[in-house]
């Protein structure tokens, strides 16, 4: 089963996915790292200190990588971790964070003020959640505000375990659309 773990930068995707990789031995594809390592991008955006992913190249590379991972008998879950994961997977978990907290997290990382504000604004208008609805069949949402990576990883586990066991009715608390932060960023 391929599941996307997406969200605005700073919501906890990488921390959570690394915990799940250790605890559950689920295979994780850190898509942003793959894009950089294998040069699956069209250009370097100096202003934003990032690369512009070539989604055609990304989509053509992933099936081979996922097939290799799924060959391992114990491996039932592959998680695609990235703020771009919702463009690729049919099932996605969107990690969210209250924009003022998100700003603090990104400032700690040393992001420029412009990049911090751009990401906080994207979070306040539900940008990634809205895109996930457009691209994915199943969308779940987890609020990471004031929570540890371990607590959030527990929620991700609950969602994935429920999907694997066919018990989606247990997942109403992760239904998207309950968070409204439009007024949180000036």
Swiss-Prot record:
ATP binds at residues 10, 12-15, 109. The keyword NAD does not apply. Residues 108-118 are annotated as: LID. Its EC number is 2.7.4.3. It comes from the Archaea. Gene3D superfamilies: P-loop containing nucleotide triphosphate hydrolases. It catalyses: AMP + ATP = 2 ADP; ATP + H2O = ADP + phosphate + H(+). One of its GO terms (molecular function) is ATP binding. Keywords: ATP-binding, Kinase, Nucleotide-binding, Ribosome biogenesis, rRNA processing, Transferase. One of its GO terms (biological process) is ribosomal small subunit biogenesis. InterPro entries: Adenyl_kinase_AK6 (IPR020618), P-loop_NTPase (IPR027417). Belongs to the adenylate kinase family. AK6 subfamily. Interacts with uS11. Not a structural component of 40S pre-ribosomes, but transiently interacts with them by binding to uS11. Broad-specificity nucleoside monophosphate (NMP) kinase that catalyzes the reversible transfer of the terminal phosphate group between nucleoside triphosphates and monophosphates. Also has ATPase activity. Involved in the late maturation steps of the 30S ribosomal particles, specifically 16S rRNA maturation. While NMP activity is not required for ribosome maturation, ATPase activity is. Associates transiently with small ribosomal subunit protein uS11. ATP hydrolysis breaks the interaction with uS11. This is Putative adenylate kinase. The lineage of its organism: Archaea, Methanobacteriati, Methanobacteriota, Stenosarchaea group, Methanomicrobia.
């Amino acid at each position: 089963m391929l599941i996307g773990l997406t969200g605005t930068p700073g919501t906890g995707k990488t921390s959570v996915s690394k915990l799940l990789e250790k605890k559950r031995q689920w295979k994780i594809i850190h898509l942003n790292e793959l894009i950089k390592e294998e040069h699956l991008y069209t250009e370097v955006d100096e202003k934003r200190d990032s690369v512009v992913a070539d989604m055609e190249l990304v989509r053509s590379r992933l099936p081979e990588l996922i097939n290799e991972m799924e060959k391992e008998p114990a491996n039932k879950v592959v998680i695609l971790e990235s703020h771009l994961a919702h463009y690729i997977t049919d099932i996605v978990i969107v990690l969210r964070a209250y924009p003022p907290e998100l700003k603090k997290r990104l400032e700690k990382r040393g992001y420029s003020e412009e990049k911090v504000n751009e990401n906080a604004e994207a979070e306040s208008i539900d940008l990634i959640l809205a895109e996930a609805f457009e691209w994915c069949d199943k969308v779940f949402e987890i609020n990471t505000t004031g929570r540890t990576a371990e607590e959030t990883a527990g929620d991700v586990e609950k969602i994935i375990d429920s999907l694997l066991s066919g018990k989606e009715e247990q997942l109403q608390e992760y239904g998207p659309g309950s968070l409204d932060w439009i007024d949180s960023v000036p």
